[in-house]
Amino acid sequence: MLHYEDRIDLYDERGKLLEENVPLEAISPLKNPTIEKIVNDIKRSVAINLAGIENALKTGAVGGKACFCPGRELDLPIVENAEIIAEKIKRMVQIEEDDDTVVKLINGGKQLLLQLPSKRLRVAADYTVSALIGGGATVQAIVDAFDVDMFDAPVVKTAVMGRYPQTVDFHGANIATLLGPPVLLEGLGYGLRNIMANHIVAVTRKKTLNAVALASILEQTAMFETGDALGAFERLHLLGLAFQGLNANNLTYELVKENGKDGTVGTVVASVVERALEDGVIRPLKTMPSGFTVYEPVDWALWNAYAASGLVAAVIVNVGAARAAQGVASTVLYYNDILEYETGLPSVDFGRAEGTAVGFSFFSHSIYGGGGPGTFHGNHVVTRHSKGFAIPCAAAAMCLDAGTQMFSVERTSALVGTVYSAIDHLREPLKYVAEGAVEVKEKEKVI
């Protein structure tokens, strides 16, 4: 059952048509099978750093920074026996022989991807089951494989799971999940927003439009969870996901191509307005005595989607020219500011993206200046305020950064990137979401 008449064409990151005449709802998290799979796999997956565990035990440096326990070292050939450990983990975690449990060794056994059977999530209250089961199974597998006694077993636990439960998170652990502990969420329903931009960039291997897509999918899917993408506002968020996140109608790609060589934030604004007029998304309302034209939207939600596509294009053009991510906050701020002055229309997310950028600028490189753009996420107290339209810009910026950041992708997200990028639909969401949309299109018998 389709509620909206909108149709879109889906393109990949190179401007190649993937599928045309797609119903807007075919990219909805409630209908698209790939997006459902992305969310489910994020919840049930945990990255386990076997090489990190081995090194921590060998040196006695367990439990995070500055924690060193002389005399508690254990020299265990964990990576060498990775296949044995993986098999033991699988036996503990798997429920049925034919269930969807995945245990995959990566990088010569240095890392391991564990995906819990979906049934374990269905009988759990929240998604931390993946970290707790994954960590617990790894501890038991190592203890069993190397016959570790009761006095050294706690050291193994700390090498695997860090200081938890002395801390509410897994501080100093050698396991990692994309979703942080629920106790750290800024509000109800913010779980999918609690993934820093650097993680998204690492998972998509710095492919800009795929990083934008994954960030947008997570942010906009969260809007369905929080009750924002509901009723009168559902179409607004679906169009935002389509145009800003999934390069619908190739708009983002074309805006970047048009302005990439010698364009600025201002020329991107001009291109967006021109395209919106051509496509009948906005129209002139009146001309002032000064000659200034005030516009009105023909379609409010579609105007927001065009503006959001232009926003990420402006970030790509501006940050891409500098090859420095630090400018993303001011680009988000002044793109929206210029757009409002140029048209008399509301900017992206009806001002929330612009307002978010003010705080984003302050906390990323103003007087405070404590965090680089890549460390921010939709659950952050600074960047939570936009309803899904700001974090895709931060992800785009970090893809284009040429190593200027203290909090680089390599520093914050190496394990996450190595392990989670092995999941195809997380690494290349544009391609696989389009395939999912085709399934919906065929099911709904759309020609």
Curated annotation (Swiss-Prot):
SUPFAM superfamilies membership: Methyl-coenzyme M reductase alpha and beta chain C-terminal domain, Methyl-coenzyme M reductase subunits
EC number(s) recorded for this UniProt protein: 2.8.4.1
Class of enzymatic activity (EC top level): transferase
Gene3D superfamilies with a match to the protein in the record: 3.30.70.470, Methyl-coenzyme M reductase, alpha/beta subunit, C-terminal (1.20.840.10)
Residues reported to bind coenzyme M: 368
Cofactor binding annotation: Binds 2 coenzyme F430 non-covalently per MCR complex. Coenzyme F430 is a yellow nickel porphinoid. Methyl-coenzyme-M reductase is activated when the enzyme-bound coenzyme F430 is reduced to the Ni(I) oxidation state.
Pfam families: MCR_beta, MCR_beta_N
GO biological process: methanogenesis
Origin: domain of life: Archaea
Residue numbers binding coenzyme B: 370
Subunit note: MCR is a hexamer of two alpha, two beta, and two gamma chains, forming a dimer of heterotrimers.
Name of the featured protein: Methyl-coenzyme M reductase II subunit beta
Organism field: Methanocaldococcus jannaschii (strain ATCC 43067 / DSM 2661 / JAL-1 / JCM 10045 / NBRC 100440)
